[in-house]
Amino acid sequence: MAEDLDELLDEVESKFCTPDLLRRGMVEQPKGCGGGTHSSDRNQAKAKETLRSTETFKKEDDLDSLINEILEEPNLDKKPSKLKSKSSGNTSVRASIEGLGKSCSPVYLGGSSIPCGIGTNISWRACDHLRCIACDFLVVSYDDYMWDKSCDYLFFRNNMPEFHKLKAKLIKKKGTRAYACQCSWRTIEEVTDLQTDHQLRWVCGKH
């Protein structure tokens, strides 16, 4: 009788308490094989815990991604800086000032054989950007012409700067250059420093 009971227990144990079935948690363990605890319940609890952990990590990843996106977004309120360095700014200002033009120093008058341009101590060029500070007129010049001796202040006052009117007092002469504003006039043949003629109020208007 005892032997039959042992064989029955062995058969039950072999059927219901195999290691594969226990690992898979698919059957209920008899009390003799583990104290009556359900392996499937433990597996379900473990699966839920794993799922919660996965969801937590996913939320944390989403939060990190959101923070990174916020940090990477450009600040719309912040205007882009267009200021250059101090040195480059000074260079730009200096270039702008230089771009306004250069003045002759000294200022020369000259006949038609003297090239026009910016006069310097080593470059004798006749200034062709003259302005009179007395009448505030630009000084005109005509190559290979000279003024007639009958010219007077009223003639230039009434006819400047119309060439077709002024030519009534212009005489052809090769090598000379006729200068005039509304209040003064000169016929020049050689290079002449403007400072030597104290009656003229002409200055270089910059090139």
Swiss-Prot record:
It is found in: Cytoplasm; Photoreceptor inner segment. Changing Q182R: In RP64; does not affect interaction with FAM161A. The keyword Cytoplasm applies. Residues 39-52 have a biased composition (Basic and acidic residues). Residues 1-75 are annotated as: Required for interaction with FAM161A. Widely expressed, with highest levels in heart and brain. Also expressed in the retina (at protein level). Keywords: Bardet-Biedl syndrome, Ciliopathy, Cone-rod dystrophy, Cytoplasm, Disease variant, Obesity, Retinitis pigmentosa. GO terms for cellular component: ciliary base; cytoplasm; cytosol; photoreceptor inner segment. It is linked to Cone-rod dystrophy 16: An inherited retinal dystrophy characterized by retinal pigment deposits visible on fundus examination, predominantly in the macular region, and initial loss of cone photoreceptors followed by rod degeneration. This leads to decreased visual acuity and sensitivity in the central visual field, followed by loss of peripheral vision. Severe loss of vision occurs earlier than in retinitis pigmentosa, due to cone photoreceptors degenerating at a higher rate than rod photoreceptors. Retinitis pigmentosa 64: A retinal dystrophy belonging to the group of pigmentary retinopathies. Retinitis pigmentosa is characterized by retinal pigment deposits visible on fundus examination and primary loss of rod photoreceptor cells followed by secondary loss of cone photoreceptors. Patients typically have night vision blindness and loss of midperipheral visual field. As their condition progresses, they lose their far peripheral visual field and eventually central vision as well. This is Cilia- and flagella-associated protein 418. It comes from Homo sapiens. The gene is CFAP418.
